[in-house]
């Protein structure tokens, strides 16, 4: 593997900021050295949300958003470099996931679209950039997601302990790590996405800090049962999903025809949906000795408490306790995937995505050579 300093850039489905990490990576280690979270302007956030929820968009608007996000990602990287005192010449490459605006891995013409012009990122930072990671897996018949389980396997596989790594971002996904067995992983369903969208609508807050709003509500059993009957939860892996499926429109359809439910009770019910849909899948894959949680949902005490209650006998903790910052897991993963791409090594796991073979992921955007 080509060792060096890499930067990972991740803007996830939760839209809570652009996460940027600096890591020293070689064949055996991934050592995080710095982190920075760059704010996403509200107008860009609203444009992304509109596209993800199927609103009509012109090619001009899509192209301009692609450009603006590329500039935003470059600004985030340059800020990290300024804060660390590093120069572009000291960085081997950037792994830039891009912003997913559509993910449709099934049907006649499976597709996934991440925007944020990597040409701009490379040009503005002066650093070789690797992006467009998902579509190569899709080309080999895979879901294109999740891709992070390969990184979980590299960092968190235990020689004897059966583990599940659970990322609760906008969407929740798990990685089953069993010594001596192929990695399994897939999206379980909503993570923070519906919770964040609902509290934004009713309280104009980006997220429910410490679950204080949900704690004051009471889960509604009728709504919960209706949500859990959604066909996605019964699909067999490999499977993946996103904001284009689980969004406020989906929630409104679930609420339609039910007696009025107080907004904070809906929030409490959404916590139950996230926790139960995750716990059901943990048990479906045979459980584990330790559930390692990362992502924004790891900071939600109500989700964590419900997972512990729903999974007796399983130790529920965070990846931080294993030395991996859970807030930066995905950005670190794409820095690591960039190192594999530059080294000509595969980054996907067919046992996770359903692809017909392992493959090198992504496209390389080199800087000019003097």
Swiss-Prot record:
Q: Which Pfam families match?
A: AnmK (PF03702)
Report the InterPro entries cross-referenced here.
Anhydro_N_Ac-Mur_kinase, ATPase_NBD
What is an annotated GO biological process for this record, any one?
A: peptidoglycan turnover
Q: What class of enzyme is it?
A: transferase
Q: Which domain of life is it from?
A: Bacteria
- EC number(s) recorded for this UniProt protein: 2.7.1.170
Q: Name one GO molecular function term.
A: kinase activity
Record keywords, A-Z: ATP-binding, Carbohydrate metabolism, Kinase, Nucleotide-binding, Transferase
- Has UniProt tagged this entry with the keyword DNA repair? no
**Under which pathway is this protein filed?**
Amino-sugar metabolism; 1,6-anhydro-N-acetylmuramate degradation; Cell wall biogenesis; peptidoglycan recycling
Q: Where does ATP bind?
A: 12-19
Q: Reaction catalysed?
A: 1,6-anhydro-N-acetyl-beta-muramate + ATP + H2O = N-acetyl-D-muramate 6-phosphate + ADP + H(+)
Describe the function of this protein. Catalyzes the specific phosphorylation of 1,6-anhydro-N-acetylmuramic acid (anhMurNAc) with the simultaneous cleavage of the 1,6-anhydro ring, generating MurNAc-6-P. Is required for the utilization of anhMurNAc either imported from the medium or derived from its own cell wall murein, and thus plays a role in cell wall recycling.
The record's annotation in PANTHER family points to: ANHYDRO-N-ACETYLMURAMIC ACID KINASE (PTHR30605:SF0)
Q: Describe the family membership recorded for this protein in Swiss-Prot or TrEMBL.
A: Belongs to the anhydro-N-acetylmuramic acid kinase family.
Question: Can you say what this protein is called?
Answer: Anhydro-N-acetylmuramic acid kinase
């Amino acid at each position: 593997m080509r060792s060096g300093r890499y930067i990972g850039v991740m803007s996830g489905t939760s839209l809570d900021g652009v996460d940027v990490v600096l890591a020293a990576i070689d064949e055996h280690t991934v050592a995080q050295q710095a982190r920075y979270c760059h704010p996403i302007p509200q107008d860009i956030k609203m444009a992304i949300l509109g596209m993800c929820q199927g609103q009509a968009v012109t090619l001009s608007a899509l192209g301009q958003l692609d450009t603006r996000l590329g500039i935003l990602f470059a600004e985030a990287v340059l800020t990290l470099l300024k804060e660390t005192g590093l120069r572009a010449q000291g960085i081997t490459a950037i792994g830039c996931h891009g912003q997913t605006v559509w993910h449709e891995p099934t049907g006649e013409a499976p597709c996934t679209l991440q925007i944020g012009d990597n040409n701009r990122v490379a040009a503005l930072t002066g650093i070789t950039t690797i992006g467009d990671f998902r579509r190569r897996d899709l080309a080999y018949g895979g879901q294109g997601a999740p891709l992070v389980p390969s990184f979980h396997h590299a960092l968190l596989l235990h020689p004897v302990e059966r583990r599940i790594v659970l990322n609760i971002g906008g969407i929740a996904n798990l990685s089953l790590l069993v010594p001596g067995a192929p990695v399994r992983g897939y999206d379980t369903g909503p993570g923070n996405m519906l919770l964040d969208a609902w509290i934004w609508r009713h309280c104009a807050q980006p997220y429910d800090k410490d679950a204080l709003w949900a704690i004051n509500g009471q889960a509604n059993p009728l709504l919960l049962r209706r949500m859990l009957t959604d066909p996605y939860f019964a699909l067999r892996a490999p499977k993946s999903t996103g904001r284009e499926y689980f969004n406020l429109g989906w929630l409104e359809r679930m609420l339609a025809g039910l007696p009025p439910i107080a907004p904070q009770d809906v929030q409490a019910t959404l916590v139950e949906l996230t926790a139960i849909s995750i716990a059901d899948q943990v048990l479906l894959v045979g459980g584990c000795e330790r559930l390692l949680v990362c992502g924004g949902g790891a900071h939600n005490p109500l989700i964590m408490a419900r997972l512990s209650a729903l999974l007796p006998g399983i130790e529920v903790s965070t990846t931080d306790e294993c030395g991996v910052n859970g807030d930066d897991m995905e950005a670190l993963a794409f820095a690591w995937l960039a190192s594999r791409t530059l080294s000509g090594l595969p980054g996907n796991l067919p046992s996770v995505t359903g692809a017909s073979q392992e493959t090198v992921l992504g496209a390389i955007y080199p800087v000019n050579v003097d």
